[in-house]
Amino acid sequence: MNRFRIVLVVLALAVSVGVSGCVTGKVMTLPGNLARSGMREAPQTAAAGRVVAVLDFTFAGTPPYEIGRDFDHARTIVWKGDPGEAMADLVADVLDEKGFRAVRVPSGEAVPGDAIARVWGTVDKFRVDSRKSGSMRLKVESAASVSLTVYGTGGSAPPNWNSTVTSDFWTEDALFVTPEGVRKAVTGAANAVAEETVRRLVAAGVIPGGKSHPAPGR
């Protein structure tokens, strides 16, 4: 091993020890809420009467939700947001972008009477794990996986229509894991699921008058 590689290894170990010393309570809390990671399309003007009701998706557990693990620091990753509400928000946002007037319906509230379609379901998986990667372990990879089972009624959809959508998304941080990097991975996976969910809703005829878009390449 040459001198340059020795210096890099020593620096990496020093940073790792320093970061580990700053960890309190063996918990990493993710900041903020999920958001659309750059709109793929400009929002379109919603047509009158085209209201789509998106009910909060269900998710097992109680807040703050344990959604993953930082293996290098042996700590859990928690998020104070609600994955079911967050996914409903993202699906509604994608519908808005495509020209539908989407209304998110919180749990226990009535569906608007003028809704042309109703969307609901369960968040089956909402997880992100982080660990060091690479031959010298100088990078940290955060791998997120989100899975959603969606149901829909309305339009020309067949009875009991449902579909399961899953997406994985990876990000890398230099040297050590950060809450922002972990959140970016979760946001990427969640947005991909929301976009594909809307595509399938339109293709199945749950939402009348829509145009089916091909799934983006990954």
What role is predicted for each listed range?
Residues 23-31, 105-160, 172:
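Surface-exposed short loop/turn segments
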